[in-house]
Design a protein with these regions (language model features):
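Non-catalytic cap/lid and distal C-terminal segments of serine-dependent acyl enzymes
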Residues: 1-134
């Protein structure tokens, strides 16, 4: 299945073309997502900053290469090469110099996964260090 699992390419390339073809949309794109989709939104915006005018994430996992659930998912989707995982880790991408002007994250503090899996403070910290508005 993973040979054909190309969600990044679908969201970045195919979906915008589909939307532009079927809806009265402008060329300006924003991206948002919840949970794993929030991770995807952050990664897409950070890796393609000229393509998106804004990024919003709701309860995203922000440092997946550093937490048990993310490590398990990355091993399944990307294999055991941990260097490849960093290309899909928002905190790592920002620390490597990837930029967006502003990131909006909404995260409930009572979320059962907040401390162990989501690690939102890690994103806040790296954004402050790199002068990215949150």
């Amino acid at each position: 299945w993973n040979e054909h699992y190309k969600m990044y390419d679908y969201i970045r390339n195919e979906l915008p073309d589909l939307v532009m073809h079927h809806f009265p949309a402008t060329a300006k794109k924003s991206i948002s997502g919840h949970s794993m989709g929030g991770l995807g939104a952050l990664v897409l915006a950070l890796r393609n900053p000229d393509e998106y005018v804004s990024v919003s994430a709701f309860s995203p996992i922000v440092s997946p290469s550093q937490v048990p659930w993310g490590q398990q998912a990355f091993a399944a989707y990307l294999g055991e090469n941990k260097d490849a995982w960093l290309d899909y880790d928002p905190v790592s991408l920002i620390s490597q110099g990837q930029r967006v002007a502003e990131i909006m994250v909404d995260q409930g503090l009572s979320d059962d996964f907040y401390a162990e899996q989501l690690r939102t403070p890690n994103l806040e910290k790296i954004c402050q260090e790199m002068n990215i508005k949150t």
